[in-house]
UniProtKB/Swiss-Prot annotation:
One of its GO terms (biological process) is translation. HAMAP family: Ribosomal_bS20. Belongs to the bacterial ribosomal protein bS20 family. GO terms for molecular function: small ribosomal subunit rRNA binding; structural constituent of ribosome. It comes from the Bacteria. It comes from Streptococcus thermophilus (strain ATCC BAA-491 / LMD-9). Gene3D superfamilies: Ribosomal protein S20. Binds directly to 16S ribosomal RNA. This is Small ribosomal subunit protein bS20. InterPro entries: Ribosomal_bS20, Ribosomal_bS20_sf.
Length: 78
């Protein structure tokens, strides 16, 4: 455990941020899985919006977001 006051604060903030990021990533995965289960235009739009939002917040890398959207679009086209 950290002894310095600022290190203690950072450790607490890290735990909170980790919980928040985990929840957001889980929600993103859920939306993508919903699209894969039922690939419709509406589900694609929801998944695409969620992916873009995650990328803009820094949750996932912009290149990963682009790759994911491309793969979902290909699945929708088939």
């Amino acid at each position: 455990m950290a002894n310095i006051k600022s290190a203690i604060k950072r450790a607490e903030l890290n735990v909170k941020q980790n919980e928040k990021n985990s929840a957001q990533k889980s929600a993103l995965r859920t939306v993508i899985k919903a699209f894969k289960a039922n690939p419709t235009e509406e589900a694609f739009r929801a998944a695409s919006a969620s992916i873009d939002k995650a990328a803009s917040k820094g949750l996932i890398h912009k290149n990963k977001a682009s790759r994911d959207k491309s793969r979902l679009a290909a699945k929708l086209a088939n």
